[in-house]
């Protein structure tokens, strides 16, 4: 799932042919690779992510700027929530495992 998610995002960015956007996206991926990987392991949220990807794709294909922008904003908000939740869950499970060792 993680690789397909990364390909989806890269495909859109590359298709833009917008050099500053491509460079920003590359830097973003370098900084947040682990966060995105941890977030992608959350199976419960995959359906939501796929639905958002479909909405964004449909809006792009329709060349509907407003719908595309709204879809992207919603997707970014969800991604931030997913990353926060994934790290909170990951930290809690690590903390629980450490306490079990005592």
Please identify what each model-predicted range represents.
Residues 26, 46-53, 90-99:
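Short alpha-helical linear motifs
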Residues 65-102:
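C-terminal effector-binding regulatory domain of bacterial HTH transcription factors
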Residues 41, 45:
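Solvent-exposed loop and edge beta-strand segments that line ligand/cofactor-binding
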Residues 1-38, 49-59, 67-77:
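Conserved amphipathic alpha-helical segments that form helical-bundle/coiled-coil interaction surfaces
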């Amino acid at each position: 799932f993680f690789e397909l998610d990364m390909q989806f995002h890269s495909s859109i960015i590359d298709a833009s042919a917008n050099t500053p956007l491509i460079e920003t996206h590359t830097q973003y991926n370098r900084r947040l690779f682990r966060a995105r990987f941890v977030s992608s392991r959350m199976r419960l949220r995959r359906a939501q992510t796929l639905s958002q990807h479909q909405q964004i794709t449909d809006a792009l294909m329709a060349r509907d700027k407003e719908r595309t922008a709204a879809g992207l904003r919603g997707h970014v908000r969800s991604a931030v929530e997913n990353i926060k939740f994934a790290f909170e869950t990951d930290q809690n499970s690590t903390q629980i495992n450490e306490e079990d060792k005592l």
